Amino acid sequence: KKDGYPIQENGCKY
């Protein structure tokens, strides 16, 4: 997972 906004439960957009 990286900085940004969450799109999934396992990661983010960025």
Curated annotation (Swiss-Prot):
- Describe, from its UniProt entry, the tissues in which this protein is expressed: Expressed by the venom gland.
The cross-references to InterPro entries, in alphabetical order and at most eight, read: LCN-type_CS_alpha_beta_dom
Q: What does the UniProt keyword field contain?
A: Disulfide bond, Ion channel impairing toxin, Neurotoxin, Secreted, Toxin, Voltage-gated sodium channel impairing toxin
Q: Does the keyword Coiled coil apply?
A: no
Domain named LCN-type CS-alpha/beta is located at 2-14
State the compartments where it is located: Secreted
- Name the domain of life: Eukaryota
Q: Which residues form a coiled coil?
A: none
Any one GO MF term held by the record is: ion channel inhibitor activity
The UniProt record lists the keyword Transmembrane: no
One GO cellular-component annotation of the UniProt record comes to: extracellular region
Report the record's disulfide bonds: none
What PTM annotation applies here? Contains 4 disulfide bonds.
Give the domain note.
Has the structural arrangement of an alpha-helix connected to antiparallel beta-sheets by disulfide bonds (CS-alpha/beta).
Which family does the similarity line name? Answer: Belongs to the long (4 C-C) scorpion toxin superfamily. Sodium channel inhibitor family. Beta subfamily.
Q: What does this protein do?
A: Beta toxins bind voltage-independently at site-4 of sodium channels (Nav) and shift the voltage of activation toward more negative potentials thereby affecting sodium channel activation and promoting spontaneous and repetitive firing.
What is the designated name of this protein?
A: Beta-toxin Cn9
In its UniProt entry, the species of origin is given as: Centruroides noxius (Mexican scorpion)
The opening ranks of the lineage are: Eukaryota, Metazoa, Ecdysozoa, Arthropoda, Chelicerata
